[in-house]
């Protein structure tokens, strides 16, 4: 009976070692699980960006309003007969804002 107990104990120790430190053990499982969580977070960010880009593409394909808005905002374009006014904050506000952004 003693040899069987010793054999079973040795088998248990070997199995525990394999579970904790062996290939595909608990350590590898936790590392891979962390990698999966990080990849899922990256995928979620990229999916949100893709959804935003697809929405913008649909908006641009859908009508002239989006194209006109983009031309006005990014290129400062105006329609014939319109006057473009740019409101510039006074120097003291610009200096205060510039000082806050460089901190």
Curated annotation (Swiss-Prot):
GO terms under biological process: FtsZ-dependent cytokinesis
Specify the protein name: Cell division protein FtsB
Localization terms from the record: Cell inner membrane
**What is the primary gene name for this protein?**
ftsB
Family statement: Belongs to the FtsB family.
- Please explain the role this protein plays, according to its UniProt record: Essential cell division protein. May link together the upstream cell division proteins, which are predominantly cytoplasmic, with the downstream cell division proteins, which are predominantly periplasmic.
Keywords assigned by UniProt? Cell cycle, Cell division, Cell inner membrane, Cell membrane, Coiled coil, Membrane, Transmembrane, Transmembrane helix
Highest lineage ranks of the organism?
Answer: Bacteria, Pseudomonadati, Pseudomonadota, Gammaproteobacteria, Enterobacterales
Give the Periplasmic membrane side ranges: 22-103
State where it is primarily located: membrane
- Which residues are exposed on the Cytoplasmic face of the membrane? 1-3
The record's section on PANTHER family has: CELL DIVISION PROTEIN FTSB
Give the record's membrane topology.
Single-pass type II membrane protein
Query: What's one GO-annotated cellular component?
Result: plasma membrane
Q: Which residues form a coiled coil?
A: 33-62
Q: Which domain of life is it from?
A: Bacteria
The record lists the membrane-crossing segments as 4-21
Q: How does it assemble?
A: Part of a complex composed of FtsB, FtsL and FtsQ.
């Amino acid at each position: 009976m003693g040899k069987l107990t010793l054999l079973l104990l040795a088998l248990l120790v070997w199995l525990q070692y394999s579970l904790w430190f062996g290939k595909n053990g608990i350590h590898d499982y936790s590392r891979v699980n962390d990698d999966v969580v990080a990849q899922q977070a990256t995928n979620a960010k990229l999916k949100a960006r893709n959804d935003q880009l697809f929405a913008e593409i649909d908006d641009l394909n859908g009508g002239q309003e989006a194209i006109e808005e983009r031309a006005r905002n990014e290129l400062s374009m105006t329609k014939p007969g319109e006057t473009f006014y740019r409101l510039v904050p006074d120097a003291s506000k610009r200096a205060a804002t510039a000082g806050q952004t460089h901190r």
